[in-house]
C-alpha cells in the first residue's frame, strides 16, 4: 500500500475517532498537542488502526507514537514485514 493511501486511511480513522477537520491533520501533527487526543482516544486510535490494517502494535511501537507520521511509519513497516 502506498504511503499516501496509508495516510488517507489514517486521516479517516482520526476523523472517526476525534472531532477534527481533515485539513488539520498533517504528517507533522502531534496527536496530543495538535489534535487534542487524550489517552482513551489514543487507545481507540490504536485499536482502529490494528483492525483496519490487520496487525498489532508492540508495546515499544505504542511508546514511540507522537505524531501522525509516527503512526504512518509503523503501519508501513508492519505492512511490509508481513
From Swiss-Prot:
Signal peptide: none annotated. Carrier of the growing fatty acid chain in fatty acid biosynthesis. Belongs to the acyl carrier protein (ACP) family. It comes from Coprothermobacter proteolyticus (strain ATCC 35245 / DSM 5265 / OCM 4 / BT). This is Acyl carrier protein. PROSITE patterns: CARRIER. It is found in: Cytoplasm. Coiled coil: none annotated. HAMAP family: Acyl_carrier (MF_01217). 4'-phosphopantetheine is transferred from CoA to a specific serine of apo-ACP by AcpS. This modification is essential for activity because fatty acids are bound in thioester linkage to the sulfhydryl of the prosthetic group. GO terms for cellular component: cytosol; membrane. One of its GO terms (molecular function) is acyl binding. The modification O-(pantetheine 4'-phosphoryl)serine is found at residue 39. Gene3D superfamilies: ACP-like.
